[in-house]
């Protein structure tokens, strides 16, 4: 046997072993329920290849032998070796002879260019299948499109993202490191030390800084005192009350623009706003949150928690920061944010709601619109769980809302800071 013939035979065997490792034969049943067998080696066949029912191994062998166009000789010099699944690797010449005798045709082998074309077509179809919307995702109905447009218009009219109209607000005094709180604040805290002690059980030192950029380009900074005893929140309370009230007014106006909300009885409107205003504000604040710096960019104002694992409320800050980071990672569209606000607003289980069934139907309508929007605008299946994630986020937001309200009421009892609107929103809606 010439060296090149032996070398070619070894190459064909190695390629076949690689094919066998990559792809197992597929069982093909005959009409009577039996298994189809390879007409060359008797192994289980997986379909017609080059005009003959064969296994995957013989298909690959025949294609490689024809493309290489090598002369194969029977090492046993008989030329009539029996080809079976166990012996097919022993004599490549007789195996090729059996392929041709079985009817396999060289002209049916695809060229390399045709193979590449076919692979590209398969990849394209696979990609199109992945990016195609899920079953039932046929796009938004006209009613859903109108619903989203109404919410987007309401958001644009009532959400001052640059805080350009936020001008009348109080600022904390500028403290230096180690400076004590003003005497009037110390006196107010000493009036009811038991109450403040109760508040401090749920508090850890706060590390929040505030930066204000003036219209003339000047910059005013507030840094919390280095001494952290939990009371450094007090100087910021009036300012935080003002910025919260400004956001609350925007959210209330957002609700009033929505026709479905205006159609509800005034009592239900009040109950829904009392329950959802804080949640809707958090959703709006999230659009201005930078996860890398932990900063909220609110126009000329910038709020930064320097120590997110410490500061503010032990029961409030950690869940709130985690919530903002979790929500921001979803990379939501503006349409998804406004639909979340609507779902939060139209919650039928808010205290004091009378027309629960009506509100429940409205909430379901907004939820279905959100689901349809995701299905027709997000790649599938990469975002197939986004709707469920958003609904879980809204559930978590309800929990944060309850914790926040309790903390604010407790601080308010010890050191009144809330604006009239805040007091109205956080007042009891029972009965």
Curated annotation (Swiss-Prot):
Belongs to the nuclear hormone receptor family. NR1 subfamily. Residues 143-430 form the NR LBD domain. A motif (Bipartite nuclear localization signal) lies at residues 63-89. It comes from Mus musculus (Mouse). A zinc finger (NR C4-type) spans 38-58, 74-99. Heterodimer with RXRA. Interacts with NCOA1. Interacts (via domain NR LBD) with CRY1 and CRY2 in a ligand-dependent manner. Nuclear receptor that binds and is activated by a variety of endogenous and xenobiotic compounds. Transcription factor that activates the transcription of multiple genes involved in the metabolism and secretion of potentially harmful xenobiotics, endogenous compounds and drugs. Response to specific ligands is species-specific, due to differences in the ligand-binding domain. Binds to a response element in the promoters of the CYP3A4 and ABCB1/MDR1 genes. The keyword Metal-binding applies. This is Nuclear receptor subfamily 1 group I member 2. It is found in: Nucleus. One of its GO terms (biological process) is xenobiotic catabolic process. Keywords: Activator, DNA-binding, Metal-binding, Nucleus, Receptor, Transcription, Transcription regulation, Zinc, Zinc-finger. Pfam families: Hormone_recep, zf-C4. GO terms for cellular component: intermediate filament cytoskeleton; nuclear body; nucleus; transcription regulator complex.
